[in-house]
Structure formats: C-alpha cells, structure tokens
From Swiss-Prot:
PROSITE patterns: PYRASE_CYS, PYRASE_GLU. The keyword Protease applies. Belongs to the peptidase C15 family. Its main location: cytoplasm. This is Pyrrolidone-carboxylate peptidase 2. One of its GO terms (molecular function) is pyroglutamyl-peptidase activity. It comes from the Bacteria. It comes from Caldanaerobacter subterraneus subsp. tengcongensis (strain DSM 15242 / JCM 11007 / NBRC 100824 / MB4) (Thermoanaerobacter tengcongensis). The keyword Protease applies. It catalyses: Release of an N-terminal pyroglutamyl group from a polypeptide, the second amino acid generally not being Pro. The active site is at E78, C141, H165.
Amino acid sequence: MKILVTAFDPFGGESINPSYEVLKNLKDNIEGAEIVKIQVPTVFYLSVEKAIEKIKEVNPDAVLSIGQAGGRYDISVERVAINIDDARIPDNIGQQPIDTPIDPEGAPAYFATIPIKEIVEEIKKENIPASISNTAGTYVCNHLMYGILNYIHKNKLNIKAGFIHIPYLPVQVLNKPSTPSMSLGDMVKAIETAIKVIVKSCKKSR
C-alpha cells in the first residue's frame, strides 16, 4: 500500500512552510504503508500538475495534501474543495486569479474521500486540537485539493484524497503578536495519526 503525501514550499513572504517541515519528518512507513513524499510549488495549476505526475508514477491508494493556514489554532481537516480561484495574494510566480473557475467543465465542488471525522477524533485522542473545516479557502490549497479530486473523479480512480491545514510553527509567529502556532512535534504526530486512519480505511475498502 502507498500513501502519497504532498506539502507546499514557502509563500507569502514566509521563509518556511510548516507543511514541508512536517513532510520531511514523517516516517517512511506507517502501519505497513509506504509513505511517498512530494513538495509541490505554491503555484496555481503547476501544483496540481506535479501532484498528478506523482499519482501516475506511484499509483497510490490515497493522497493526503498538507498546507499552511496561518491564523488557525488547530489541525483543520477539510471537508470540501470548491471550483473557484480567488487569490488574496499572488502565488509564487505572480499569478493572482480572481473569481476564476479551476475547471470550467468540472463539478462545483468535491467532498474529501478520506474519513474526516474519524481523523479528527483520533488526533484529539493524542491530545492535539483538531476540527473539521468547511472551507479550504480559495487560494492554492483549495486549488490543489480540488484538482486532485477532480482528476480522480474524471479518471474513475480508486484513490482516496483529502487535505489538512496546519497552523504556523512557533518560529513563524515571533513577530506576529497573538497569532496561534503549534509545535512541529505535535503537527507531525497529528499527520501520522491521520495517515494511520487513512491506511485503515483503505484496507477496509480493498
């Protein structure tokens, strides 16, 4: 069994992206599943292209994408991706789409196909705050989640997929008073816990 995990490079003036720091620290094997790791650029369309290339290469049982959501307090397991780009800031190559469909012929939205409620409950059992989020935003994170689910749907692939937003790391909020953060250790434990739930779910549906 293979689980593909994606993370982003830094964006918006940050020198690090916690999603990539978490990715680098994940175990290579979790519950018997090989963990395939890839960093994708914080760039509209190119992020999806890179993820799809890897999906074609490794044929994973599930894809879990991780992204930074500065200002959030907890591990946010996303429920839905919507078919719109509406960028508050430019991406890493200067693109800033406003009110633009990701795929003009795609569905209005796709729900995550990983077990989001079980993931939240298991993370909480590790004494790490977590919740279901009903919006992944309209920036590159939502774009990637939608793009992956859209690709899976259109090609009728038996691959589960979802997205988890994580807070800033403490080092990122040194000059951001009152902005929440979470330790790298807790975030790694949370994502590995989520992967365990996903692996169990994939085994059940085989």
